[in-house]
Amino acid sequence: MDVKFPPYLTIRTARSLVNKCEEALGSRQRDVNFDLSISVFSDPFAVTLLAGAIKACVKKGHRVQFVKPNVKKLDEWFDSIGFYAFGGADPGSAKYSERQVELRRFSNLDPTYTEQVLGVLCNDIRMSERVRDSLRMSVNEMLTNAFDHSQSPE
């Protein structure tokens, strides 16, 4: 089943995105193709929404595939944040910059992910090791709370 997404994947198009995600989740076919071919722009909100839909589709037993955006810049951005790998396509293809962190499923606290987040936060800001340690503890606490309060079995 092909689910064709709109040109703009943003919080302003949330209703359309939610409808498309529900369409994918409701599919009775094993293969669900997220067709992003006409998409030209995405914001982090849309990526989070799509990632949640992908995870739910995989959990329901769907095989998720992508029709990648025709816009090269958007395609490269999705690849660079691990979006395709998150959905099971192109594993290991992500190429992260110092301003990005990988889109990832959590089952517990991961110190390497905390270091990636700190790398992004500290990329343009000089801070003492003491402040960095405090920030590390805050990020760990935030990730722990998010997982503990998500009521998710995974």
Q: What label would you give each PLM region?
A:
Residues M1-K4:
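Short beta-strand/loop segment at the start of cytosolic alpha/beta domains
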